[in-house]
């Protein structure tokens, strides 16, 4: 009984982590900002969003800087000091790979408070 409860809790956590979040357009503070700054506010936010996220293979410091749900900032060894890059790992067995990618997405979600 305890194992089935644990499996249900894990599957619910994975489902919640992968569920797309909704963004409510036009909140009060965003509307005030747009009125004060005019067209520059939206352009600045769009440019900032493009520049902040990194692609695979680019150097990083935190998980939340990398683009993609299961792309994490991993240490790459080969020099004297480790270099951190945005990386994704794949497993050869598809069922295990799906579980591993969900685990990485949860890990990224848990560490996202550092970038805010």
From Swiss-Prot:
Residues 1-17 form the signal peptide. Keywords: Disulfide bond, Secreted, Signal, Toxin. It comes from the Eukaryota. Contains 3 disulfide bonds. It is found in: Secreted. GO terms for molecular function: toxin activity. One of its GO terms (cellular component) is extracellular region. Residues 18-50 form a propeptide. Expressed by the venom gland. Belongs to the neurotoxin 25 family. F7 subfamily. This is U3-theraphotoxin-Lsp1a. It comes from Lasiodora sp. (strain IBSP 8539).
């Amino acid at each position: 009984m305890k194992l089935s409860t644990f499996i249900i809790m894990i599957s619910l956590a994975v489902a919640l982590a992968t569920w797309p979040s909704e963004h409510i357009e036009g909140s009060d503070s965003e509307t005030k900002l747009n009125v004060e700054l005019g067209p520059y506010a939206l352009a600045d936010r769009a440019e900032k969003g493009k520049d902040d996220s990194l692609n695979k293979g680019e150097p990083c410091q935190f998980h939340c800087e990398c683009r993609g749900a299961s792309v994490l900032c991993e240490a790459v060894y080969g020099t004297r000091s480790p270099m951190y890059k945005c990386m994704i790992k794949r497993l050869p067995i598809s069922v295990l790979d799906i579980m591993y990618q969900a685990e990485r997405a949860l890990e990224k979600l848990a560490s996202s408070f550092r970038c805010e």
